[in-house]
Amino acid sequence: MLPSLIQPCSSGTLLMLLMSNLFLWEKVSSAPINASEAVLSDLKDLFDNATVLSGEMSKLGVIMRKEFFMNSFSSETFNKIILDLHKSTENITKAFNSCHTVPINVPETVEDVRKTSFEEFLKMVLHMLLAWKEPLKHLVTELSALPECPYRILSKAEAIEAKNKDLLEYIIRIISKVNPAIKENEDYPTWSDLDSLKSADKETQFFALYMFSFCLRIDLETVDFLVNFLKCLLLYDDVCYSEF
């Protein structure tokens, strides 16, 4: 099930409510981690950069998804797929559950959010970025191999791949200051749809592209929400829960 707190239609609204409320607070609450002022200052700088990247990635995910639906390269097939999927709720649920990052347990309720630690949220972001690292590389490779693929789509895929790497570096640096025991090589979900993405059968390949862009968009918006929420927790701690 798509976590109710981070649905594409609601995460932006939640984030705006959350951040607008913070401007009313003059006194910064205690941070959720034990660290020196110097380390907290470094973390703030890292999160400032991370939130910019996550926001850019989220927007690119939305734009690329729209390009697939609007460009003649893929629009006919994509619109047919979405019509078929919406013939039943079961089809939609099955499609979402096929996203390879579903095993990453993002909190589904406000109560779950409150029970989740700062470090656990960090690990979610780390695992999600790692889970997309190789798939994004393959996406760029396969789109580049399609002569009819427009640059408008390919360029978005290339930008997302590059920014995913950059954001991953920032998250790893943040983790090194919060808890070095969290390792980059921890288990994370693996993607197993490369054969479909490389398929010579257009219908199979385009369905793989449809699902790829669908799952990617959801996850990029999730990452953006989580990175901003982590920054809020670092700066304001419990105040961040006040708008949920």
UniProtKB/Swiss-Prot annotation:
GO biological process, one term: blood vessel endothelial cell migration
Signal peptide: 1-30
SUPFAM superfamilies reported in the protein's UniProt record: 4-helical cytokines
InterPro entries (UniProt xref): 4_helix_cytokine-like_core (IPR009079), Somatotropin/Prolactin (IPR001400), Somatotropin_CS (IPR018116)
Cited Pfam families: Hormone_1
Major location (coarse): secreted
GO CC aspect terms: extracellular space
Keyword tags: Disulfide bond, Hormone, Secreted, Signal
MF term (GO), any: hormone activity
Disulphide bridges, residue numbers: 99-215, 232-240
Location in or out of the cell: Secreted
UniProt similarity note: Belongs to the somatotropin/prolactin family.
Protein name, as recorded: Prolactin-7D1
Origin species: Mus musculus (Mouse)
